[in-house]
């Protein structure tokens, strides 16, 4: 349940909401005007898939995970896109679009207007992520015979969380939470290695 954000009035830079009856208002009243959003924290659709191929000594394996229909409240934007928080927190580059004069079309109210905990913070956190990528190359046996000691040799690369496609503007759409507030994201990881068998 949240109050529905209706944008910023281009005439005076004040935020607007829809009240419980669907009328525009500039008075935020969470108790009276909160409505069921129909959005859910848990994705009704989720899954994963993988693919692999090999050619001669080269092999590539990739694993993906996805979720669809998941929503999260991006509370980072409450602090990073809020003119009243500018002296306490770093601000997002979007703050360059803050309302400054009549006629400005923006979703960021003028300085002095408090951002509220409404639907403009609720975001689609559906995503597709490459979870793992493994690329390895095994050297030909005839090359190893020439070494007179090494039976097998291969080099490999492992990458984790290399790619994420999402509309979510926060750092990471994957955590199993309904509200993000400067949470550490899943990190990208890179591993290079060599395996020798004597």
Q: At which residue positions do the language-model features occur?
A:
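C-terminal beta-signal and terminal closure region of outer-membrane beta-barrel proteins
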Residues: 1-12, 103, 115, 164-198
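Outer-membrane beta-barrel pore domains and translocons
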Residues: 54, 65-67, 158-162, 197
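Membrane-embedded beta-strand positions of outer-membrane beta-barrel proteins
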Residues: 62, 155-157, 194
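Surface-exposed loop/turn segments flanking beta-strands in extracellular/periplasmic regions
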Residues: 23-28, 81-95, 173-183
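Flexible loop/turn segments at secondary-structure boundaries
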Residues: 61, 68-72, 163-166
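Strand-connecting loop/turn motifs
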Residues: 55-58, 150-152, 187-189
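Outer-membrane beta-barrel transmembrane strand signature
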Residues: 1-61, 105-125, 129-132, 136-144
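Extracytoplasmic gating/loop element in the C-terminal half of outer-membrane beta-barrel translocons
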Residues: 10, 67-154, 159
């Amino acid at each position: 349940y949240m109050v529905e954000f209706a944008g910023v009035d281009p005439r005076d830079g004040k935020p607007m909401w829809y009240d419980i009856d669907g009328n525009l208002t500039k008075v935020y009243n969470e108790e009276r005007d909160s409505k069921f959003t129909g959005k859910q924290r848990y994705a009704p659709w989720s899954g994963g898939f993988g693919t692999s191929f090999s050619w001669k000594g080269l092999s590539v394996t990739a694993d993906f995970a996805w979720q669809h229909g998941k929503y999260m409240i991006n509370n980072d934007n409450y602090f990073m896109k809020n003119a009243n928080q500018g002296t306490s927190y770093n601000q997002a580059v979007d703050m360059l679009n803050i309302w400054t004069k009549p006629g400005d079309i923006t979703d960021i109210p003028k300085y002095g207007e408090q951002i509220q905990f409404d639907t403009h913070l609720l975001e689609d956190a559906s995503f597709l992520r490459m979870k793992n990528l493994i690329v390895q190359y095994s050297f030909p046996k005839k090359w190893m015979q020439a070494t007179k000691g090494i039976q097998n040799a291969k080099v490999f690369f492992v990458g984790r969380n290399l790619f994420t496609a999402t509309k979510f503007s926060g750092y990471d759409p994957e955590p199993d939470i309904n509200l993000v507030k400067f949470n550490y994201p899943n990190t990208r990881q890179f591993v290079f290695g060599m395996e020798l068998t004597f």
